[in-house]
């Protein structure tokens, strides 16, 4: 079982090494293996200052190359679940068994060291994943379109700039699966289209788990859905049925 680590602040970047099935340098496609790529068992989350669980007993699996939507009204725990699966937050209980490589939540910038420049953060990840720094930097620079801002400390970035940097890094390193939390809302329409083409076009053979309120986007790119409601979850193999139920829940 791949351990899922968690931490906060500057140390959060170290979570990336814990998400891989093998050493951090072995981040290549593993989709040829058999069986599910992710198995979650009895997962629960209760925040320290809350007496009521956000969700309890979540159990589900995701196939290699599967495309799973996370649906639910605001406050039901979709983003929290994405962060738990990505190692950003700890679960209160349960197990997470990743059997394929997985990205950190795309667009999540909380793992960057704020006092370092964008370039320095790219260099850190290049060392962590044993990737050529110049190649990684060129990919990030080309995709994120931050220009001279890459030479500035990340703490001076806007939330959108941090998201672009995180998105660029997520796509500069190849993973078997990608965690997505409304990431295509980053930037202007042109950049959003660029994000969609990278994730859903060029990486069409990869697994993804996506939390989004955009039912059209979900309908185009997901084949199953997990609906979270009142702390429980139900899996749907029919994406259209899931979207109908989700639309009804939002209208209640």
Model-derived regions: residue spans:
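Helical segment within the ABC ATPase nucleotide-binding domain
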Residues: 192-204
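ABC-family P-loop ATPase nucleotide-binding domains
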Residues: 101, 106-177, 182-189, 197
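Conserved H-loop
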Residues: 205-212, 214-220
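Conserved beta-strand-loop-alpha-helix hinge in the C-terminal portion
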Residues: 232-252
